[in-house]
Amino acid sequence: MSSGAASGTGRGRPRGGGPGPRDPPPGETHKLVVVGGGGVGKSALTIQFIQSYFVSDYDPTIEDSYTKICTVDGIPARLDILDTAGQEEFGAMREQYMRAGNGFLLVFAINDRQSFIEVSKLFTQILRVKDRDDFPIVLVGNKADLETQRQVLRSEASSFSASHHMTYFEASAKLRLNVDEAFEQLVRTVRKYQEQELPPSPPSAPRKKDGRCPCVLL
């Protein structure tokens, strides 16, 4: 479970207060990036996680940043979250924020087939920019409340995520379904990845014996 305080720089959107006196100091900082096609609900997911508020009107985002200090699995962390543009005209900005991210929430809408095709391209681009075969990424099928309009089967998305070593969540920003769970899992994935990337600690040198004979005082 997570808990904490939040703040944001979203234009015209509600802001949370800064960390309160009861919030533990963060022991770690993670830069998380929310990516996906236009209109899939990236901002709605982010604001619901940050401020427990559902944004119903679609307002195309250029770039908004938020901060949340929370505790995941008993460990306090500062999350710097970047909500990115999904519109094609802002595609040139993608590689810039991909270079800075420690982990990615890859979002499509279950009622939008094209957005699912888009996440495959974004996944490939992230690995290319990072020059890695693997990276901390969580796949989210948003708008699960629109089940009757579904265009992407759950089994299809699950198969795609499993083949690329990602955890998959079907979420709804409107219902606050699996919103916290997706972000918390991304934090866990980032932690695990960073632990694996750390170089092993050098073995401690054995203590040398001084070679002197023990003395007995009479």
Swiss-Prot record:
Its annotated function is as follows: GTP-binding protein with GTPase activity, likely involved in the regulation of MAPK signaling pathway and thereby controlling multiple cellular processes. Regulates the organization of the actin cytoskeleton. With OSPBL3, modulates integrin beta-1 (ITGB1) activity.
Q: Where is the lipid attached (S-geranylgeranyl cysteine)?
A: 215
Q: Which gene encodes it?
A: Rras
Q: Which GO terms of the cellular component aspect does the record hold?
A: plasma membrane
Where GTP binds, per the record, is at 36-44, 83-87, 142-145, 172-174
This enzyme catalyses:
GTP + H2O = GDP + phosphate + H(+)
Q: Does the keyword Nucleotide-binding apply?
A: yes
Molecular function (GO) terms for this protein are: GDP binding; GTP binding; GTPase activity; protein-containing complex binding
Q: Which keywords does the record carry?
A: Cell membrane, GTP-binding, Hydrolase, Lipoprotein, Membrane, Methylation, Nucleotide-binding, Palmitate, Prenylation
Stated name of the protein = Ras-related protein R-Ras
Q: Which residues are modified to Cysteine methyl ester?
A: 215
User: A Pfam family this protein belongs to?
Assistant: Ras
For this chain, the Swiss-Prot or TrEMBL PTM comment says: S-palmitoylated by ZDHHC19, leading to increased association with membranes and with rafts/caveolae as well as enhanced cell viability.
Recorded hits in Gene3D superfamilies, A to Z, give:
P-loop containing nucleotide triphosphate hydrolases
InterPro entries, alphabetized:
P-loop_NTPase, Small_GTP-bd, Small_GTPase, Small_GTPase_Ras-type
Q: How does it sit in the membrane?
A: Lipid-anchor
Chain location of the short sequence motif Effector region per the record: 58-66
Similarity comment: Belongs to the small GTPase superfamily. Ras family.
Here the segments flagged for biased composition (Gly residues) are 7-20
The answer on whether this UniProt entry bears the keyword Cell membrane reads yes
Q: Where are the residues of the annotated region Disordered?
A: 1-30
* Propeptide section residues: 216-218
Gene Ontology BP terms: cell migration; face morphogenesis; leukocyte differentiation; negative regulation of Schwann cell migration; positive regulation of angiogenesis; positive regulation of endothelial cell migration; positive regulation of endothelial cell-matrix adhesion via fibronectin; positive regulation of vasculogenesis
> Could you give the subunit structure recorded for this chain?
Interacts with PLCE1. Interacts (active GTP-bound form preferentially) with RGS14. Interacts with OSBPL3. Interacts with ZDHHC19.
Q: What is its main location?
A: membrane
Query: What is the species listed in this Swiss-Prot or TrEMBL entry?
Result: Rattus norvegicus (Rat)
* Coiled-coil zones: none
The EC number(s) this enzyme carries: 3.6.5.2
